Amino acid sequence: MTTFYTVISWLSVFGYWLLIAGVTLRILMKRRAVPSAMAWLLIIYILPLVGIIAYLSFGELHLGKRRAERAKAMWPSTARWLSELKECQHIFANSNSEVASPLFQLCERRQGINGVKGNQLQLLTTTDDTLKALVRDIELARHNIEMVFYIWQPGGLVDQVAESLMAAARRGVHCRLLLDSAGSKQFFRSPYPAMMRNAGIEVVEALKVNVFRMFLRRMDLRQHRKIVLIDNYVAYTGSMNMVDPRFFKQDAGVGQWIDMMARMEGPVATTLGIVYACDWEIETGKRILPPPPDANIMPFEEETGHTIQVIASGPGFPEEMIHQALLTAVYAAREQLIMTTPYFVPSDDLLHAICTAAQRGVDVSIIVPRENDSMMVRWASRAFFTELLNAGVKIYQFEGGLLHSKSVLVDGQLSLVGTVNLDMRSLWLNFEITLVIDDDGFGADLAQVQDDYIARSALLDGERWNKRPLWHRVTERLFYFFSPLL
């Protein structure tokens, strides 16, 4: 009996180290950033069982077998649709400004289509303006409404949006609503899903959270896009979730959330539509490609208006696309670079690009919230401040609430707005959407908004920053080490 237990003990020890060795080898063989690999190895060797379970759950990008098969199956039809779209040459921009050309060329070669022109574009900077405009557009809808959001939380003006959406469905408008399971958990626990389905709205819970399937699909992979499409002509996207900030996270101690949205009319609605169609097919298996380009786009033909490129990122879309786009935009800057983000945990490449821009004479400003709803991100982001300050980057800490807007403005001409945070989750993991706008008029509008943010912010003083307590420095470095996992 003693021999039996001895054998079992040795087999357990052997299996234990074999499992650690196997996971270690898998991490080393995967093509990933060195800081990320080192962080995972540290966790596994300090807390082996916890680390292995965490890595198998969150360490690799598992879309899930069923969704991966759908993503693979949809591309032939999507490619044909894009080929038909490219025949409508009148909607595509033939040239771009000097600062925007590299980024638009990158997008065209990686995504297959160029930016579209002739769009009307309005920047909305308050929740009230956005939700009221959205209600008006829903009330005017005649054919179809598609929406995707990370968070939909009932309450306040959001309930007016829900009521107008149900009224539209009852009068015959085809309505689809795609909401992230984790972000919109309060919505799915409310009476609204049943009410909306009874009204005729297709409501889909995206990327359902199921602990029993945690090893089959990465649970923290989230649908982070915010898109509204109405009659294939009007579109919205930006940083705002479907929430009324007067009722959202009031106990978080960070103040009201500050967002911006873009309202568009024109052919960009069609390019956003193909992104929505892909998301819908990946989640439901149903194909809903936008109407044929000729029927849908001809009314949009205009010589004036904004030129916009759409960047869709996430599993099943061109790899590293948004990361490459941000790097290209930063390196294109010659005079000024302004970035706003609620979560600043950049990759090493992006950090170095920003610092290099400042060191070659570009006026670089980063606007982040002073208070953050994520304690881990708050400390991790502070670990980058010293390097940024030493390079000459100006860091503004917004004091008027949780600044949730995501924007980049390059030389007053090239603008990027959308859902992407400057952190690892947005850059490498989540489903995100970004608008790239080549227009100095829109750039002036965005600059005005950013100037307002700066006026409500405090400039971080380098000398005072260097005198912060030792325990702050230690905490920052601790969270910095795990920043590749945030």
UniProtKB/Swiss-Prot annotation:
One GO-annotated biological process of the protein: cardiolipin biosynthetic process
One term of GO molecular function: cardiolipin synthase activity
Catalysed reactions listed for this entry: 2 a 1,2-diacyl-sn-glycero-3-phospho-(1'-sn-glycerol) = a cardiolipin + glycerol
One term under GO cellular component: membrane
PLD phosphodiesterase domain residues: 219-246, 399-426
Enzyme Commission no: 2.7.8.-
Catalytic residues of the enzyme: H224, K226, D231, H404, K406, D411
Transmembrane segment boundaries: 3-23, 38-58
CDD domains membership: PLDc_EcCLS_like_1, PLDc_EcCLS_like_2
Pfam families on file: PLDc_2, PLDc_N
InterPro entries in UniProt: Cardiolipin_synthase (IPR022924), CL_synthase_A (IPR030840), CLS_N (IPR027379), PLD-like_dom (IPR025202), PLipase_D/transphosphatidylase (IPR001736)
SMART domains, A to Z: PLDc
Entry-linked PROSITE patterns: PLD
UniProt topology in membrane: Multi-pass membrane protein
Compartment list: Cell inner membrane
Keywords: Cell inner membrane, Cell membrane, Lipid biosynthesis, Lipid metabolism, Membrane, Phospholipid biosynthesis, Phospholipid metabolism, Repeat, Transferase, Transmembrane, Transmembrane helix
Similarity comment: Belongs to the phospholipase D family. Cardiolipin synthase subfamily. ClsA sub-subfamily.
Function description: Catalyzes the reversible phosphatidyl group transfer from one phosphatidylglycerol molecule to another to form cardiolipin (CL) (diphosphatidylglycerol) and glycerol.
Stored PANTHER family: CARDIOLIPIN SYNTHASE, PHOSPHOLIPASE D
NCBIfam families found in the cross-reference section: bac_cardiolipin
Protein's name in the database: Cardiolipin synthase A
Organismal lineage: Bacteria, Pseudomonadati, Pseudomonadota, Gammaproteobacteria, Enterobacterales
